[in-house]
């Protein structure tokens, strides 16, 4: 992982740990999770890696290998307003977690994505990867649903993306060689194993050459149009 090598070059020490959150694909159910529909999905073996080390002074200092500008803020004094950059996902995660738990320890780190940005829920992956590291250095344990809801709140309430919980659920619940089935109305879920009677298969993901951000594709307008269509 390049993030580990860059971390060692920059900080002249081994990272404390490397956090990981996979990307996800959703064969059926995309865009109906925010209308309490039933979805399925699975995680893939690519995702977000973050090499990090705790900082006892409470400072979060992260550099992305995919975006310019280093993120830096106090974990217990997150700016109230988003800043309009990639690090809003980190700030939102820290703010939502800090509303429930006392955060004292920050972290320094290098974060990287292994595929082009957009289409595989990379924003949710960044948040969950960062949350898992922030929880670890502060001695906090989140149950799976609490992790999902905290990550979702970071996007909804801080970043300003009106997403549902499909992305976060796939990334938290998914298991190798299983398909996740989730009812977003009551949050019940099932991990369906690959049948021994199935023929071998592979999942192919194609990059169109276009990168996008949910903040720039009128995602909220898309939801409004979908709701109007239902009516």
Predicted features along the sequence, with ranges:
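A short helix-breaking turn/cap at a secondary-structure junction
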Residues: 179-197, 206
């Amino acid at each position: 992982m390049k993030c580990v090598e860059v971390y060692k070059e920059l900080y002249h020490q081994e990272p404390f740990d490397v956090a990981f959150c996979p990307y996800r694909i959703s064969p059926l159910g995309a865009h109906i999770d925010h209308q309490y529909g039933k979805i399925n999905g699975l995680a893939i073996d690519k995702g977000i890696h973050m090499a990090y080390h705790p900082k006892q002074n409470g400072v979060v200092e992260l550099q992305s290998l995919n975006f310019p500008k280093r993120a830096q803020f106090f974990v217990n004094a997150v700016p109230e307003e988003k800043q309009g950059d990639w690090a809003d996902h980190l700030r939102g995660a820290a703010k939502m977690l800090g509303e429930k738990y006392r955060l004292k320890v920050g972290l320094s780190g290098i974060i990287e994505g292994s595929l082009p940005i957009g289409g595989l829920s990379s924003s949710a992956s960044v948040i969950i990867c960062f949350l898992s590291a922030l929880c670890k250095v502060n001695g906090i344990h989140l149950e799976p649903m609490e992790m999902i809801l905290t990550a979702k709140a970071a996007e909804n309430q801080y970043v300003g993306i009106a997403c549902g919980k499909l992305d976060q659920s796939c990334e938290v619940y998914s298991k190798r060689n299983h398909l996740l089935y989730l009812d977003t109305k009551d949050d019940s879920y099932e991990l369906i194993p690959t049948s021994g009677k199935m023929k071998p298969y592979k999942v192919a993901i194609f990059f169109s050459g276009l990168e996008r951000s949910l903040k720039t594709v009128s995602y909220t307008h898309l939801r409004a149009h979908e709701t109007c269509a239902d009516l």
